[in-house]
């Protein structure tokens, strides 16, 4: 067990010579603009990334976003893994991710498919995003995501390295020690309605970006399914 206050008291003098700098005040949050970008290369597979502006580290919806990510493509029980890989056999690797930063963030989906299946796979991903925006996730699906997230947090806490990283992140990003129990309680408090509203705000079609790396030369069909 790490006593945060005791640790700061003992280590603080070693850093007295380092003076705090001024916060960066002139920052403009980037505004994502949807577009399709092709990077043609003669590859066996097409690497596809769908992205959208996400949440910042301090956004109170970040716990809902974590659960949304888990449900969408965060594990083998996720919607993308089941639909794209298990049912359709379109991709071996498919997952979603979230990357929160100080003032903004990014949510994304990655998959690699046969070039002949790239359009079909992209359409299926968009279909799954539309489903998340259309109705709340089921109680069972939400419960599974909560339990998975709690399990991941508890397993990570067994690592000394993860504990040190967690202490540093709390100090740098939040200026306070956030107990694991507090995080778990906030995860457990997320409702299906909150996830639905978050999905609607994130997965707006004209803000989605699509990048394809591989042997695709015509972006027209992808623009058609993405923006029409």
Give the label of every model feature segment.
Residues 74-90:
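M16/MPP (pitrilysin/insulinase) zinc-metallopeptidase core fold and M16-derived inactive scaffolds
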Residues 1-22, 38, 56, 64, ...:
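Charge-rich, well-structured scaffold segments of protease-associated domains
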Residues 28-32, 83, 109:
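Catalytic cores of enzymes that engage adenine nucleotides and/or redox cofactors via long glycine-rich
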Residues 12, 23-78, 216:
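His/Glu-based metal-binding/catalytic segments typifying zinc-dependent metallopeptidases
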Residues 69-73, 82, 147, 169:
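Generic alpha-helical structural context detector
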